[in-house]
């Protein structure tokens, strides 16, 4: 190194001797973008235009560079390293000085300086917390300045900034690079009950019951609630002077007996970390009273009956008081704590409305029960005992009834089918028969009117004179070629065949019976394909 070095600021030259202190040199090099350390004799081929042009020309010509991390981060109180490496080129250049600077709002503040001849200097604000990592640099006269990484310890929020590592070289000039340092503040999280005593009063009002707070965090935390309790949450952020943020959230509910002993969980998320805290609500409320012991079956002479006053309260009930509406309590009772014992058998005098009042420090509530006394026990039907023999006899009777019902149904069906089959044709089995409408005739032909008996037999219960009646006159029918005997077998038949159209005339003029309008075939008749029927005897022949 030459005895004299020249610091150029703009187009002006400043000379400083080599024996000057580091602090004096540091003051000269505070504006790194404008001041360069170069020899008085310029290298051949370099033309000075301005400081930036010189820097670019040296970079292009020699290829020196400074390597740093793009960014670094740490929490308050932690230790972090800011790397700075100098990559020399060919031919190599000579490192005259290394300077670390802090850039805040466009202003540069020197942090540490390493000079091969003058040693290492750390400025006062960082003196106890910043040091060079490489042992060769920490020597009184640094032997190597190619690795000038610094170590930040006990980080503070004020350390957050951009830091510049600048190398002053000969004859290449200055090389620099920058690293951004971010400082995080881990918040302090806690959850508390809003009030040590939460009271459910009348009228009911909403109130905050728990508070979750994440204080002095950077960046701010996110708070959520996890609970089955119905309510709503409020959130508030406060920015502190040091750059941290305090987040506060209250959970608001309507205090009641149902909210007592409910669990509230606060979930705080800070970056990738998660914190949880829980509280159990302690809600004080008036007693909830219910009287038990009356089962609706207090009958005369029933022994050992009692009434119990059960109260759900927080804090617990301290006083129980019994009374009977519209009267005084019977003489045969004994009160122990919350129970009313009735001595002796039940009588009608025990009936009435019993009231129990329960009192705690929050208030007094009451419950009542209406006691009715009956003469006989009220035994539910499903609880009555049925003898075993009744069970067996009932099963037998049920089986018998079921069997009889099935038998009757079978007989009815059999009778029905038999009666239908008994409706047969009452003629003889002589010749082939044809069906005409609803009546029958022989194959020889159909007369104008079927032969009718001259006398009809009246039923025995008829009111008219029971004697044969002559059918004659203009309204009568011709007897044809055949004479009928009043005592013949044909007249004793209950029906005879007529044409359907003529049957109406018979109904109007005679006492003849009406018949089924549908043709019926006897069991000894066989139906033919042409619509006729013949007797089985003729069919087999």
Curated annotation (Swiss-Prot):
Keywords, comma-separated and alphabetical: Cell adhesion, Cell junction, Cell membrane, Disulfide bond, Glycoprotein, Membrane, Repeat, Signal, Transmembrane, Transmembrane helix
Matches recorded under Gene3D superfamilies: Immunoglobulins (2.60.40.10)
GO biological process, one term: protein localization to cell junction
GO MF terms held by the record: cell adhesion mediator activity
Positions of glycan attachment: 51, 105, 180, 242, 326, 337, 372
Tissue specificity statement from the Swiss-Prot or TrEMBL entry: Expressed in the developing eye and nervous system.
Protein name: Nectin 1b
């Amino acid at each position: 190194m030459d005895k004299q070095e020249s610091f150029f600021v703009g187009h002006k030259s400043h000379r400083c001797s080599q024996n000057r202190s580091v602090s004096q040199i540091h003051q000269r090099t505070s504006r790194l973008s404008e001041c360069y350390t170069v020899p008085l004799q310029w290298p051949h081929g370099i033309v000075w235009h301005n400081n930036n042009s010189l820097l670019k020309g040296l970079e292009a010509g020699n290829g020196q560079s400074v390597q740093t991390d793009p960014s670094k981060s740490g929490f308050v109180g932690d230790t972090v390293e800011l790397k700075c490496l100098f990559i020399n080129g060919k031919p190599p250049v000579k490192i005259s000085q290394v300077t670390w600077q802090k850039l805040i709002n466009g202003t540069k503040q020197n942090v540490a300086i390493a000079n091969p001849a003058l040693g290492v200097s750390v400025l006062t604000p960082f003196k106890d917390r910043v040091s060079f990592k490489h042992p060769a640099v920490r020597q009184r006269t640094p032997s190597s300045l190619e690795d000038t990484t610094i170590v930040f310890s006990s980080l503070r929020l004020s350390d957050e900034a951009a830091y510049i590592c600048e190398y002053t070289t000969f004859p290449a000039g200055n090389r620099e690079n920058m690293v951004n340092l971010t400082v995080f503040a881990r918040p302090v999280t806690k959850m508390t009950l809003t009030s040590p005593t939460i009271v459910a009063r009348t009228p009911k009002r909403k109130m905050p019951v728990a508070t979750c707070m994440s204080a002095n965090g950077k960046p701010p935390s996110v708070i959520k609630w996890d609970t089955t309790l119905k309510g709503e949450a409020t959130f508030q952020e406060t920015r502190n002077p040091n750059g941290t943020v305090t987040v506060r959230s209250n959970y608001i509910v309507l205090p009641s007996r149902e909210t007592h002993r409910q669990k509230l969980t606060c979930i705080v998320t800070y970056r990738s970390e998660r914190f949880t805290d829980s509280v159990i609500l302690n809600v004080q409320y008036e007693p909830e009273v219910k009287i038990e012991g009356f089962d609706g079956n207090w009958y005369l002479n029933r022994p050992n009956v009692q009434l119990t006053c059960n109260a759900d309260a927080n804090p617990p009930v301290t006083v129980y008081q019994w009374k009977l509406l519209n009267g005084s309590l019977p003489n045969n009772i004994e009160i122990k704590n919350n129970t009313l014992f009735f001595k002796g058998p039940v009588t009608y005098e025990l009936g009435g409305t019993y009231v129990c009042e329960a009192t705690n420090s929050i208030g007094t509530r009451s419950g009542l029960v209406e006691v009715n006394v009956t003469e006989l026990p009220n035994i539910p039907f499903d609880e009555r005992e049925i003898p075993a023999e009744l069970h067996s006899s009932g099963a037998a009777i049920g089986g018998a009834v079921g069997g009889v019902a099935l038998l009757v149904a079978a007989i009815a069906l059999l009778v029905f089918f038999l009666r239908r089959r008994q409706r047969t044709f009452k003629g003889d089995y002589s010749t082939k028969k044809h069906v005409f409408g609803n009546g029958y005739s022989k194959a020889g032909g159909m007369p104008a009117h079927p032969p009718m008996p001259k006398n009809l037999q009246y039923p025995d219960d008829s009111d008219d004179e029971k004697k044969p009646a002559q059918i004659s006159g203009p309204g009568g029918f011709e007897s044809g070629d055949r004479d009928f005997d009043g005592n013949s077998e044909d007249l004793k038949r209950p029906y005879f065949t007529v044409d359907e159209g003529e049957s109406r005339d018979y109904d109007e003029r005679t006492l003849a019976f009406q018949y089924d309008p549908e043709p019926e075939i006897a069991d000894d008749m066989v139906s033919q394909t042409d619509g006729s029927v013949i007797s089985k005897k003729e069919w087999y022949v």
